[in-house]
Amino acid sequence: MACGSSLDSIDMNSIPLVALNYTVRHRLCLYLNPDAVVAADWTRLAEEMGYDYLEIRNFQRYPDSTMKLLEDWEKKCFRATVGGLLEMLKKMERNDILTDLGPLIEADCMKYLEKKHVPLPIQDDKVDSSEQYRITKSDDPYGSMPETFDAFICYCAQDISFVQEMISRLEQTDYKLKLCVFDRDVLPGTCLWSITSELIENRCRKMVVIISDDYLDSSDCDFQTKFALSLGPGAREKRLIPVKYKPMKRPFPSILRFITVCDYTNPYTKAWFWDKLAKALAR
């Protein structure tokens, strides 16, 4: 995409898909809706977004499959950003779309950013601005674009080495997942419990619970796990992913026994561990 100089300093992955207006979406549909023998169409885009065969077949029922796909992805995925869409189109080698729609996309993004730079409402002196708007290091200071993550990592200090390996394996590889690691990402000086609750409930799609003997003694981990479990009985199995990365001397926590464990200690499945975990988080 031939980006204009006005957007050279903007991270397109920070701009949500809602920034794209109808004109861009309609033209994108004109490119992707027709069945193509050579060029990748909307079904390939759906695969890049993580949809499976049956879900893609379901989209075929709609007269405008591409438009329906974009709307569904926007609702379900926290990472539905303009940058994410552009990366997928580039991977599909649809340079024709990037070239043709580039100026329109840039214009929509600039309009979106301009709308966000509006004067803040008068704030109560009793409410600290960092507490009201900024929770994480990459949060928008004006509160218009809160930082979101693929997963909140529930861990105790003794297991930090495995957390660092998770960062290396899941963020710094082709998986390109975004993890919320409290000690790395959260700003100091805010209420611990309210910030943790906000992150788990509203900022993170999933929560990885790193289980160990030390985890069982952590009051912070206990609160985070029980809070996540309390959010919704129907969705908690999809939200919570327990990970066992080393042998334990004490019994596995009973409140997590009904959820499938991602077991790093099993020598027979260890080779598939990271790929399975990454796909579970991206789902």
Swiss-Prot record:
Residue ranges of domain TIR in the record: 147-281
GO molecular function: TIR domain binding; Toll-like receptor binding
Pfam families: Death (PF00531), TIR_2 (PF13676)
One Gene Ontology term from the biological process aspect of the record: defense response to Gram-positive bacterium
Keywords: Cytoplasm, Immunity, Inflammatory response, Innate immunity
Endpoints of the signal sequence: none
Subcellular location: Cytoplasm
Chain residue ranges for the region called Intermediate domain: 106-143
GO cellular component, one term: cytoplasm
Domain of life: Eukaryota
Keyword Cytoplasm found: yes
Classification via CDD domains: Death_MyD88
Domain Death: 27-105
Phosphoprotein in keyword set: no
Cited function: Adapter protein involved in the Toll-like receptor and IL-1 receptor signaling pathway in the innate immune response. Activates expression of target genes in the Spemann organizer region during early embryonic development. Is required for normal axis formation.
Domain notes: The intermediate domain (ID) is required for the phosphorylation and activation of IRAK.
Name of this chain's protein: Myeloid differentiation primary response protein MyD88-A
